Amino acid sequence: LCELEQYISKLAEKSDDKKPNKRDTFRNFVLNNFDENHKLFTLTAPTGYGKTLTALNFALKFNKSRIIYALPFTSIIDQTYDIVAKIYKNSDILVSKAHHKTTIDEKNLTEEDRYSKIKFLMESFSGEINITTLYQLIFALFGNKNKDNVKFNQLKNSVVIIDEAQAIPL
């Protein structure tokens, strides 16, 4: 939580406008209305209001084992991962990304490691913050393969964020 708040503060410092902006107002409203007794939330705001970081900030307040951040498009997953990984690069928080185009840089891995730790983290939602596709989340809930069962078990004591839910094909 601390790293994220520092990142958000740095963004505000870089802004030419020193008065509270729409993002600050939106984030403060969301965070001030946090109620851990509720289990389901919706977050709706126009583009540019900082929903991604606000949702992550909100999810961190629950103090659960992990966050599963599901998005519909690989481009948004990559963009979100880049931001979140940058925020937590100097911390012990493990941020993982998994979609069908995710690759592992295997040139520095031993044969033993090639299909162990990194691949397991990518495919199992075992990081503290896991950024993935809506399809991976759906497979975790309804899949019938062993790797889906591993993901399903990781949903316990987790906060699940479904971003751009309107993009789910029904």
Which functions belong to the PLM regions below?
Residues 1-170:
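N-terminal helicase ATP-binding lobe
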